[in-house]
Regions:
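Basic, glycine/lysine-rich polyanion-binding surfaces/domains
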Residues: 1-236
């Protein structure tokens, strides 16, 4: 059986008193219903600080996050904890697993084409995830999403925001952009690289750019799930 561990991911366990209520008031997606969901923790201005998948484990929540960002995410969440009886810590006994087509686990909540994920003790490192993710046009992590407005990260198209759940950090600007249908720039994956790339991945021949929707690069990968959004007229 092929190895499936995504070694660049970490798991944060949030446990204690009213964990779902605590996380619900902070992140962009609704964590009170069926999980997993993809969510962001934003600045008050609606810019992305961290993105992660939220899983349930009994009364606890597990955050499937970028490994290099895990400690900073814990610190950021702890700011909001105040006097709540809540613990936020790495769970080193659990790893994130991925398969393109094994059928094991749960479908990635962002896009079924991404494959399936599950949480379990680590095995060998998975191969092919980076290129597969980029080829279907999905961006993640601070290098790709960091400090961009959440809707510019294609969050609405990838099920990464709820406009009915109520307040979250950065909700006001995010909701305003959605109401005005004003998303002038988008994150896109392009073939090759260039001076305007946010991140380049020469090992797979792909890069991530932050482009105006009225000036999409000719070498951009435009997946079906994003075409309708890019067809909307931009505003100055």
């Amino acid at each position: 059986m092929a190895a499936t561990t995504l070694t660049d991911r970490a798991v944060i366990r949030v446990s204690g008193e009213d964990v779902r209520g605590f996380v619900q008031g902070l992140v962009t997606s609704d964590v009170m219903g069926e999980l997993p969901v993809w969510a962001g923790l934003l600045t008050p201005q609606g810019k992305c600080l961290f993105d992660f998948l939220v899983w349930s484990d009994g009364d606890d929540l597990l955050l499937d996050c970028e490994g290099d960002a895990a400690d900073e995410l814990i610190k950021r969440l702890s700011i909001y904890r105040l006097r709540r009886q809540i613990r936020i810590e790495r769970d080193v006994e659990i790893a994130v697993h991925w398969s393109k087509d094994s059928g094991q686990g749960s479908a990635d909540p962002r896009l079924p084409e991404l494959g399936t994920r599950w949480l379990a003790p680590a095995d060998g490192p998975a191969t092919g995830w980076l290129e597969h993710r980029l080829r279907v046009g999905v961006c993640e992590g601070r290098a790709e999403l960091g400090e961009l407005l959440w809707l510019e990260c294609n969050a609405a198209e990838l099920n990464g925001v709820s406009f009915t759940k109520g307040c979250f950090v950065g909700q006001e600007n995010t909701a305003r952009m959605n109401w005005r249908q004003k998303v002038n720039r988008r994150l896109l994956v392009v073939i090759g690289g260039g001076e305007r790339s946010r991140v380049e991945y020469p090992e797979v021949g792909l890069s991530v750019v932050h482009a105006r929707v009225d000036a999409i690069p000719a070498n951009a990968i435009v997946p079906d799930w994003l075409k309708d959004a890019l067809a909307q007229p931009s505003t100055a």
